[in-house]
Every structure is written in structure tokens, then in C-alpha cells.
């Protein structure tokens, strides 16, 4: 026989697991949708879009779709880590890195060795975990709070930005250029009826 407290604890555990799985899947689907929207954005001079391969001879629209499909489960994994993983930022980042390296390998396998999304795997994985971490602690979720939390997680593992570039430098700085000017411009154009895809 079990006590009422034991049964209550067990029910709370089951409910939390259900909630965490549902939230992780939702965040993962949102990350996948973001990748597809970014791919569909046309024109993107020099980059792969719906109309052409830009400056690339080793990849096309369908190479990117293959990459998005194979890496999609990774973002839900990152969100699960944010919801249920280590509270310590450096330990959390170590787990994200492990998942990220596997996702990179999956991407390279699906694309015949072509790097279509290495930076996006890093950035959206970190953002997925940050969004989930805010949800875990009942904190307000916004683009700004997600980016700040992502920067906090990454900075706890890599405190010095010296020598960083690309996606890692952007993460260390809280994705500042994405927040301003990019996000306000995107929102304004969407309100004005522009096709933002």
C-alpha cells in the first residue's frame, strides 16, 4: 500500500512528464517551422532559396529540406533538457553540445556531407533550451527573455567571448542583431501585409 503523499507525488511526476513532453514537442515543432520559413524566404541573394542556389554549387532547396527533416527531433531534445535537465548553465550546455554534435552528424549524413545548418543547429538548439528553461521556472517568455537566457546558458559554459565568431559570438551577445533591427523590421513588414516567408 502507498500513502496519500506517495500517490500524490507519483501523480505530480506523471503530470510533469506529460507537460514536459508536450512543451518540448511544441518548442521543437516551432524550431523546425522557423528553419523551413528561413529556407522559404525568397529572394536571399547568394543564399539558397525557393528560386535558386545562390552562390552554392553543393546544395539546393531540397538538400536543406532533407537537413531540416533529419534534425527536427533534436530541437525537442534540447527543449527537454531545458525543462528537465541540469539547473546549472554550464552542465546544461554540455548536454546541449552532446545532442548538437549528434544532430550535426545526422545533418551531414542526410546531405552527403554538406553543411546546411551547423550554425542553425547550434543557435536554435540553444534557443529551444532557453525557451524551455523559462517555461520550467514560470518566467515570462518573450523574444528578449529567450535570447537573454540563451546567452546566460552559453556564457556560463564559455565566459570569454574572445575568439568566438559566427553563431557562437551571436549567442554570447544574446542574438542582439536578431532582436534589433531584424525582429522589429520583420514584425512591421508582416503588419503591413508583406509576405514574410
Give names to the regions the model predicted.
Residues 2-89, 93, 131-197:
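Phosphate-rich cofactor/ligand-interacting catalytic cores and adjacent structured alpha/beta frameworks
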Amino acid at each position: 500500500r502507498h500513502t496519500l503523499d506517495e500517490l500524490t507525488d507519483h501523480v505530480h511526476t506523471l503530470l510533469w512528464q506529460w507537460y514536459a513532453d508536450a512543451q518540448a514537442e511544441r518548442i521543437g515543432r516551432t524550431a523546425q517551422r522557423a528553419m523551413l520559413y528561413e529556407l522559404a524566404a525568397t529572394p536571399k541573394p547568394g543564399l539558397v532559396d525557393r528560386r535558386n542556389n545562390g552562390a552554392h554549387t553543393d546544395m539546393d532547396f531540397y538538400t536543406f529540406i532533407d537537413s531540416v527533416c533529419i534534425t527536427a527531433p533534436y530541437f525537442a531534445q534540447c527543449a527537454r533538457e531545458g525543462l528537465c535537465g541540469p539547473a546549472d548553465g554550464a552542465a546544461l550546455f554540455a548536454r546541449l553540445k552532446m545532442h548538437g554534435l549528434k544532430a550535426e552528424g545526422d545533418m551531414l549524413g542526410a546531405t552527403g556531407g554538406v553543411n546546411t545548418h551547423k550554425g542553425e543547429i547550434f543557435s536554435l538548439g540553444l534557443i529551444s533550451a532557453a525557451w524551455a528553461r523559462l517555461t520550467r521556472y514560470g518566467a515570462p517568455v518573450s523574444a528578449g527573455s529567450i535570447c537573454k537566457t540563451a546567452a546566460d546558458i552559453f556564457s556560463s559554459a564559455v565566459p570569454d567571448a574572445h575568439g568566438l565568431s559566427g553563431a557562437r559570438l551571436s549567442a554570447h551577445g544574446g542574438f542582439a542583431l536578431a532582436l534589433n533591427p531584424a525582429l522589429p523590421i520583420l514584425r512591421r513588414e508582416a503588419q503591413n501585409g508583406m509576405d514574410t516567408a
